[in-house]
Amino acid sequence: MTVQQRSFLGRALYVGPSMRTLHEQYAKHGSVDAGAPVLASCEVTVRAPSSEVWELLADIARWPSWVPGVRQAHLDGEPAPDVPFRWVLNGMRVKSTLAVVQPGSELSWTGTLAGTRGVHRFLLEPAHGATRVRSEESIGGPLAGLLYSSDKLQAVLADWTGALKSQAEKTG
């Protein structure tokens, strides 16, 4: 049964996988939670090599300088699987853990925000001298569908990938 087929109450009360399961079974294995009540994806082509796009994404401490809504970001070490990081998005504190760190091709993490659990993936693919960037995210947990909407998440992903494109093309 798809999220759209579930009743309002079913979407509102969706608990979904534990954070550990989301991290180990979903994010590390190339997927978001397709059953989550909040899902979105966005794709953009950036006129810059994937190495330059990667440098922007992987430098989490610099996110506040170019990612809309991010005011603080701190990584506890070098980017690597299972390394935690904390950041502030639109005034809300997010606790995240990197799941996949494949230079030039994928940066994925799991995180918690206001009682919700999310999986976020950035996928980079070379495309004739440019880079195709796909961003996808799922947000689940009790009341996630009431606190947030797929449309709102779609707008956030579009803003983020748009800023990534602008920043990478400016430096590239």
Residue spans for each PLM region:
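Compositionally biased, charge-rich terminal segments
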Residues: 1-5, 132-136
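Hydrophobic ligand-binding cavity/cleft-lining segments
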Residues: 2-77, 163
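Alpha-helix N-cap/helix-start and coil->helix boundary motif
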Residues: 50-51, 60, 92, 140, ...
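Glycine-rich portal/gate segments that line the openings of hydrophobic small-molecule binding cavities
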Residues: 8-14, 45, 64-65, 74-119, ...
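Short, conserved loop/turn and helix-capping segments at secondary-structure boundaries
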Residues: 57, 114, 150-154
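A conserved amphipathic terminal alpha-helix motif
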Residues: 10-25, 132, 138-172
